[in-house]
Amino acid sequence: MEKPSREAFEGNNKLLIGIVLSVITFWLFAQSLVNVVPILEDSFNTDIGTVNIAVSITALFSGMFVVGAGGLADKYGRIKLTNIGIILNILGSLLIIISNIPLLLIIGRLIQGLSAACIMPATLSIIKSYYIGKDRQRALSYWSIGSWGGSGVCSFFGGAVATLLGWRWIFILSIIISLIALFLIKGTPETKSKSISLNKFDIKGLVLLVIMLLTLNILITKGSELGVTSLLFITLLAIAIGSFSLFIVLEKRATNPLIDFKLFKNKAYTGATASNFLLNGVAGTLIVANTFVQRGLGYSSLQAGSLSITYLVMVLIMIRVGEKLLQTLGCKKPMLIGTGVLIVGECLISLTFLPEILYVICCIIGYLFFGLGLGIYATPSTDTAIANAPLEKVGVAAGIYKMASALGGAFGVALSGAVYAIVSNMTNIYTGAMIALWLNAGMGILSFVIILLLVPKQNDTQL
């Protein structure tokens, strides 16, 4: 069993602030580039394709390595991995701002992805170790504010900073926040698993996972350009299927696997993780809806972003409400309520056939429900995932949960964008946007069914 010395140390507000600040280095600062793509094209004198690679590579690398980092946190120390992640963010930020060389921009963003992979599971594990009962639920609420809230604010934040101070100040501020986080976390006793032997790291599993995810990403983002009957597409599909199959076989046989599939024997953990993947996938809503109102209704990017202000406000407000609902109703009901409300919001945003004024009203109300639903869902889902993981495996469990977040968002955006482009070319942008938004609503419905079937009414397995 793990011995985190709770008698000697209990989580406090100083540590919690440090944790939240470390979390927003990714969800707020690193993600802010989604709103400064044209500026980066001019600053680095490069094409939009290169900039898009730089923007997307952070979340992709975070998703690919977060599980492995969770395992390292369990073995070598969660405080240590958190500090390493913060230092990596500082290094990545410096590489981004010191020159106008596109290669350094991409390398810096890649390093920021590795930073997020270290920080996310390690900080969740620290909360699991040093916060108990209602204190843990409160800590998870603030952690969720840093992640879900940060992702909601990042677009406006990036645009505001880039306009008022210049885009490099996004990362200068990120470095300052990182240094403050290091100071606040300093002095916290180390916590790690005592029951996991320090075996050789599962390199084979990691390599196969990276190959599989990179191949899937290429298939989704470039599939329509390649053509589903092309030799390259078929080859990539075979590589993806083959690497996935081999990964499953090797991981089940490994004595110290990268992903411990035994965790999924717990239905509550499986339900929380699968629904988390799908509800992060509905991030495609923002891409599709914003693109539609700009191209279809002639709105500026600022006007398009203004439609989602209700989402930003509600997700921040409702995260703490979700915590209170968790304490009074348990995990399942808030997760179902949140997902159901989100589906209603998604359906309202998809009504692209309405006259402009009516559609704008539906969008504003829809985004309100969208943020309300995600805010209610966030804390109960996170609590369900880590509360149902064995203490000695909590780093790996948290890593898998956050991998679901990162990859759900990445693939949700890719799928939504692909469907929007394909259907728009076949029909028109109104129909393309509607079908793509229905895809997101479908992911919400599937998430609702998973929660209904897998998450128990009472979490008897909570530790």
Curated annotation (Swiss-Prot):
Keyword presence, Disulfide bond: no
Family stated for the protein in its record: Belongs to the major facilitator superfamily. TCR/Tet family.
Topology relative to the membrane: Multi-pass membrane protein
Keywords attached to this entry: Antibiotic resistance, Cell membrane, Membrane, Transmembrane, Transmembrane helix, Transport
Molecular function, one GO term: transmembrane transporter activity
Localization, UniProt: Cell membrane
GO terms (BP aspect): response to antibiotic
Principal subcellular localisation of the protein: membrane
Gene3D superfamilies: MFS general substrate transporter like domains (1.20.1250.20), Multidrug resistance protein D (1.20.1720.10)
Alphabetized InterPro entries for the sequence: MFS, MFS_dom, MFS_trans_sf
Chain's gene name: norB
Main function: Multidrug efflux pump that acts independently of NorA and is one of the factors that confers resistance against diverse quinolones and chemical compounds.
Protein name: Quinolone resistance protein NorB
Segments traversing the membrane: 17-37, 53-73, 86-106, 107-127, 142-162, 165-185, 201-221, 230-250, 273-293, 299-319, 334-354, 357-377, 403-423, 435-455
GO cellular component: a single term: plasma membrane
